[in-house]
Amino acid sequence: MIPDKLQNIMKQDGVVAIATLGPDGPHMVNTWNSYLKVSQDGRLFIPAGYMHKTEANIAYNPNVLITLGSSKVEGLHGMGAGFLIKGKASFVLSGADFDFMKEKFGWLRATLAVKIESATQTW
């Protein structure tokens, strides 16, 4: 479900924006492209150090929008490619998915797991 071009973007320097919607409106948080990992079943894993507002919003509404890109990857109109990911998210506080990410990011308090519903190249 994760296109090769998106996987290539994830290896590059860049910022990821994660949007959630809670009872008091939208909220955005950022992380780095290189922090994103893919599970064996195709879910997107994101280390959460803080993200307390994001966690509260996901408990209220699990829908997330994620954007990321890189100027170093060939896109639809030359150099520069980006994606919009839509999915359902949950916070994982223990178990195999948590341990997988904790090994890579010792500072995390939780794993943000996203079941991808669509990944659309936007640029």
Language model segments and positions:
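Binding-site signature for planar aromatic cofactors or substrates
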Residues: 1-123
